[in-house]
């Protein structure tokens, strides 16, 4: 997740830009930079690595970076390596424009070949294409140049732009990527995250898709996609801790959905490198996994249970060991057939879930090996487990989990690779492929967010008036369908049910009527053709079928009403990408229904009672 900040003010702007970038560090980054207009010329400073490196470099070049107007950026590499050359801001060849960018420009290479053949490029980024395209269209009017350039671009983006011909202004625009403008006591700002600006209160504007914003030290002007000035009413915002923590997003849930690339990156890097999985807090002898392990039982509640449903298939496929997935509130009252050769796994975001804790204590009575996956290191489940895998999702405010779910899921992937290596049930070649895909998941999740947000928003318009919605899938996709269904019901309050696709004909298909929405999850596995058959069955009875699948299934659009594509990865990990548009679909459906998204009725974040 990249971060943008810009300010047109009355004092020296460089220190405030650096401070703002430090406030954006939590989003994840690998390089950072600023640009300031100094004596009607653009001066920039960029560094790879930590922002403290940028701070030191900026201080050493302070005289050249003196100015009242500037922009800054934290970059997480998507196009090009994390080098100084690829860091933002990027500048035009004539040095008139500097630009920072969040998002992905999907047709950057096509634009290079069609419109920028005479331009020289110095980075591997799509962003450099944008700044040079704006410069190409610029005559005397920046708004017109930005408008014309944006019409050529495909993808999602938020831009902060400097032009040396207008040394007291910043220009900004957005398309599918959040950006806000704020008029405060010390000047006017643009930012992707309210927590980055040094103001206690201000007039707050969301930059809508296609709008162009022009800010100076004491004014904010807006133009529509045709370049015509428009009037917008500000929201008066007190930058309280809650408002700041939302980071410019309307709800914590949406913010946490978009934090998933960073949460997954931090979690994955805590146990994986390109050669192996290292679980520091798992102290089970290798010979147990190879010679003694008889079965694995995963126990959890709610969304954590759904990660178990997905993880079961990953572990069984890679480790060749039977896995049962149990609902903690049921399991705790059972008489489990377990012993010292059973590995029991307990999944809980808070580490305090009452039923999961009771299940853990039950298993310890049978001398089973216990391992927990938790997000809170000081939690009781972590303390009472023999072994622990910690997730690094960070604090999750919204009741409906998103980033913690995704962090639990990649932890199960890691556990599967770890056990498979001990049991020698995967080849070195397969292990290497899995590790490479695991390490690439954060970037693929980021791409999924950028590519599917608008599609999920549009699809929500087709389903939000429905009284019933069905989610279907097979194997890995069934667990994903369960999670999509739970998200939909808990925040939209629409009756939503999930089913294994093959079970439809055993009763549920009688509920399908003309226009009933069916969300089908279909990853590229050996059972996709079976899911396609189930889709045909419900289509024949009048259902509106919306398919979520990966890019390898390009022909699938011919037999469904609409489709959302996500990037492809190895089948074992595809759920991590397929779940993203389901989270977004639930969010935008609930938003259309004006639900209390962060605090849905009757639900609590941590269920610490039976």
Please place each PLM-identified region on the residue numbering:
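Glycine-rich phosphate-binding loops that contact phosphosugars or nucleotide phosphates
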Residues: 291-432, 436-440, 474, 521-565, ...
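Glycine-rich oxoanion-binding loops at beta->alpha junctions
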Residues: 68, 72-85, 275-287, 311-347, ...
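Acidic/histidine-rich
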Residues: 153-187, 459, 464-490, 532
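Generic C-terminus detector
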Residues: 544, 557-559, 569-610
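Active-site phosphate/pyrophosphate-binding segments
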Residues: 260-264, 268-297, 387-517, 527, ...
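Conserved phosphate/anionic-ligand binding catalytic regions in large, soluble enzymes, centered on
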Residues: 24-33, 102-106, 172-181, 249-253, ...
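Conserved short alpha-helical segments that host acidic/polar catalytic motifs at enzyme active sites
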Residues: 1-250, 259-294, 333, 428, ...
